């Protein structure tokens, strides 16, 4: 369950039309909301219930429809030292706002904001004051949210989301008590506690997701090493059966970002779509065969010749599957996270921070390819990329927040 399907001066109203040389006639208009580093995650919702979608990143809400008005829902951070020292330094530091998700947590019909801080820190919900002025109440609802790509997904089938995180060396998710939604969520481990797992599943582990891999209607857990099958009864904590992948490369063992389960080639079986290394190269989909094994189909590698359109970029630290062109097939939206580890960290840290969508094209014979289309070359992704509707034309738009700023891309 994703709500996305909701310099010192801040610059408003800057627009740029970016033509996409695509097979599909898709173009985007770029609007720069801020050129400051405020966050690496963002989301959208109608926070003030005026009928227009708004954007949140960091401690700020930009109000639609033109996003020229902004308000702070919580005071600016005042961190004298550490990795999130303020003001946030894009060349050296990080933000307290790693990812953000909009959802009505307390059931009053007003969207609240869930913020994941740095990996291993607490997850907080900021409660919407129902349109009243002032800062929003802050509630810590989970104390140790590990992993670099936490999410918000319905894992138990009750129609309401859980925190898709792992914690203290165990994979799983955190279940919210909807009678007391702002209290501490209960962690539901699916792997055993062990010294080996403490090293394997730690605060900076990359690659995590959920999706129904075996067609039983229950979401399973995805990792770079394989998938964990949800049992029919999860009323009590239990170890979930593991099915090996792996979903990556031997020379890129770190893992990517958000992982997705989707029937890419239309054969009725769920496949896995993922980036390979959140701080390196690689994007691909892994076809599930009839016997449960997987065949890799690489979409993009480290060299232009690895991709039919000659596209190659590194640090794919956020990914979503969304139908971008209305053909009924889910496409990939991803890009480059700039300066993830500073100006000299990782590979090609100063290459253009690009933002792309990869169009899924099926051949009708069980095969499929993804065609690369550039959206922008001066933004990229953060640790999150959000796709939703910013206007009323019905076409999916894209928003990102990262060390370059905060940007909205309106599909034309």
What are these regions, as identified by a protein language model?
Residues 1-6:
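N-terminal secretory signal peptides that target proteins for export/translocation
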Residues 9-19:
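Bacterial N-terminal signal peptides
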Residues 22-412:
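Beta-propeller-forming repeat regions
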């Amino acid at each position: 369950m994703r709500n996305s399907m909701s310099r010192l001066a801040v610059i408003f109203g800057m627009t740029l039309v970016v033509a996409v040389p695509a097979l599909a006639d898709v173009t985007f208009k770029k609007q720069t909301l801020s050129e400051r580093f405020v966050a690496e995650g963002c989301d959208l919702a109608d926070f003030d219930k005026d009928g227009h979608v708004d954007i949140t990143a960091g401690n700020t809400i930009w109000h639609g429809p033109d996003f020229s008005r902004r308000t702070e829902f919580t005071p600016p951070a005042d961190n004298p030292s550490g990795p999130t020292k303020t003001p946030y330094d894009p060349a050296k530091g990080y933000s307290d706002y790693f990812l953000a998700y909009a959802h009505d947590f307390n059931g009053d019909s007003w969207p609240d904001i869930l913020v994941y801080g740095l990996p291993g820190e607490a997850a907080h919900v900021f409660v919407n004051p129902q349109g009243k002025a002032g800062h929003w109440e802050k509630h810590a609802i989970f104390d140790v949210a590990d992993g670099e790509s936490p999410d918000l997904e319905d894992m138990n089938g009750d129609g309401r989301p859980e925190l898709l995180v792992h914690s203290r060396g165990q994979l799983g998710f955190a279940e919210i008590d909807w009678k007391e939604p702002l209290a501490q969520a209960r962690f539901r481990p699916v792997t055993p506690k062990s010294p080996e797992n403490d090293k394997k599943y730690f605060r900076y582990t990359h690659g995590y997701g959920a999706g129904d891999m075996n067609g039983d209607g229950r979401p399973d857990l995805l990792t770079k090493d394989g998938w964990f099958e949800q049992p029919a009864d999860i009323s009590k904590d239990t170890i979930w059966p593991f099915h090996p992948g792996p979903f990556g490369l031997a020379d890129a063992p770190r893992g990517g970002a958000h992982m997705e389960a989707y029937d890419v080639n239309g054969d009725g079986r769920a496949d896995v779509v993922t980036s390979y290394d959140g701080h390196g190269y690689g994007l691909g989909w892994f076809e599930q065969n009839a016997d449960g094994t997987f065949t890799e189909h690489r979409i993009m590698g480290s060299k232009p010749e690895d991709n039919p359109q000659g596209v190659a970029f590194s640090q794919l630290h956020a990914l979503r599957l969304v139908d971008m062109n209305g053909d009924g097939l889910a496409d990939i939206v991803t890009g480059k996270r700039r300066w993830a580890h500073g100006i000299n960290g990782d590979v090609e840290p100063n290459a253009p921070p690009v933002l792309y969508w990869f169009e899924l094209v099926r051949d009708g014979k069980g095969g499929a390819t993804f065609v690369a289309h550039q959206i922008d070359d001066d933004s990229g992704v953060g640790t999150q990329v959000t796709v939703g509707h910013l206007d009323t034309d019905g076409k999916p738009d894209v928003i990102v927040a990262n060390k370059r700023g905060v940007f909205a891309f309106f599909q034309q």
